[in-house]
Amino acid sequence: AQIGIYDAYAGAFRTIHHNLEAALTATGVNDASGQTNASAAKASAKSRFESTKQRFFNHLLMGMKASTVIRAIEDDVAEGFACVIQVVSTGESLLKHRLEAMDPEDELVEGALTPRDYVLSYLEQAFPIHAQKLVEIDGNMVAEPLRDANGTLVVSREAEALRDEAMMELMSLAPIPSALDQILWAFGDEVVAEVTGRSIRPLKSSDGALFIEKRSASSNSSETRAFMEGEKDILIFSDAGGTGRSYHAAQTAKNQKRRRHYLLEPGWRADAAIQGLGRTHRSA
């Protein structure tokens, strides 16, 4: 099933890539031969696309790992281990973006909390749909945005249709929530200590409904204490939440269970990932 989901998202990105090239021609950024008339506009659109793609697939892979990690944690806890999960991203910016866009009366659902929104934001904000016109500057023909009599940017209907096609394909795909949220929902916040930098988080009530909980400035300290005191058997931390803290079975800690450390998301910095591993591997 996961292979099918991944292939579907890969297909959606292939559509975006193809439509992006077509839109660059439709708007006049590229000419019919593929030569660029507006190198800055093309570079901006393509760099935003590549960074969005990289960010999205990182989140997608993390989310798809979650089910396997959850099963492993269940086994570890049953065997008497205390589990520590290391991540980098928390998805807070995505959550805040979604909440800002929602109507106050709308119900929060899992499908709304997916990194798919990163790509939709790119398509809405950075996909090239504005027509360009050729002008001569210092003997060189370059493209600049075309405006109507009122000074409003002119939209290329062809490029707009290409964007909408890509958005429709993307929105039809199955949502994959973040790994952090999936772990919290699977075990419950009464079992999982969260030590991250986010100020709000989505939790599930006993009936499965999602709600938003605010986290205070002291949340990380109290969550760390709960884990080290043995009140919670699972701890998940991010770069921001892990700074200056230790999660090993220290002689002064009540929680003397052996640790199982899951490097779920190593991130882009090897030194930070290794430093995180050290938080469960201390000598005293």
Sequence positions of predicted segments:
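Conserved helicase/translocase motor-coupling segment
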Residues: 1-99, 162-191
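Conserved RecA-like P-loop NTPase helicase motor core
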Residues: 95-101, 107-284
